[in-house]
């Protein structure tokens, strides 16, 4: 049996991930309406942390540190492995989703780093270039408006 993968990505490409054999899961406080994905809200940063970071009262370093503290109080490894064992043989793995297009601007890259260091779990950003030919009709992000609304 092939090992199942854990990838990260953003909501706008949920259909791409699903169409290519990955089961999507939201790791955000709010999942966009109509998004066909499961949820792991325990991996989302707190509202206070998110708001502080977005409006500049918390630095990037503090955000990372506080998010790591939050993750260390959760059973992150168990939460992720529970999702992996529910996959069908045809499914390649799971994709952990949030809003930011750029993974460096987002908690999903912090979560991936945390899992790599704490549990030796290899979690990488989903490579959309690999599936470019399959999805060439999808030039516009499905949830572009939501991303704009959150950035205000």
Segments (PLM) and residue ranges:
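Residues lining hydrophobic/aromatic ligand-binding pockets adjacent to catalytic sites
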Residues: 1-152
